[in-house]
Amino acid sequence: MRRTFAIGDIHGCSSLLAELLKRISPDPQGDTLVILGDFINRGPDSRGTVELLLELKRQFRHLILLRGNHEQMLLDYLDGRHQGLFLAVGGRETLASYGADPAAVASTSWLPPEHLALLADLPTCYENEHGIYVHAGLQPGVHLTGQSPEWLLWARDDFIRSNHDFGKRVIFGHTPFADPLVTANRIGIDTGAVYGGRLTCLLLPELKFVSVAATGSYSWGRHQR
């Protein structure tokens, strides 16, 4: 059975991602690596994070990069929508990592084409024998194929508090916890790396957690979008 390594929200903490990958050492040919979205914003090195993801894409046969709400907000920003929201929730840090001016809303020239192509073509969910993987959560009682982007990218309490059986465990990020949340129907692995917590990987089927502790905090509060 192929192992799956699932990694929570990175938020521009590229050095933590690099260190975590060294610790878990997944097999690029045999293992599946799933990263649950929110690669960018808030942290110091969104550009370096995307560059590392592109390198992983070249290395791994089974790499799944999921869309998070922050990738969606970047795409909206580039499309001229919700610009203030993007900048307020860490977009300024992303732009700074690319050496870009927040005033250059209408232009994508600051974003390398390979980076834009990766960020614009991310699925919102993935399923394998070990579980269902999403950024934020699922709407109880709705089949996976009928889930809305609002739930997949933005869900919080209504999903987290639900006892609904989704058929498989749901592996998710988005909502930070001090330690991974483990229940019968879901596992939350956002452990607040950008807030001074940890970047966490879940190894399946072993149900083992591996984390790298942050050395500082790059954002002032939790549960902001």
Regions found by a protein language model. Give the residues of each.
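Core catalytic region of metal-dependent phosphoesterases/phosphodiesterases
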Residues: 3, 7, 12-85
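Acidic, His/Gly-enriched loop-helix segments that form or flank divalent-metal centers
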Residues: 27, 87-199, 204-225
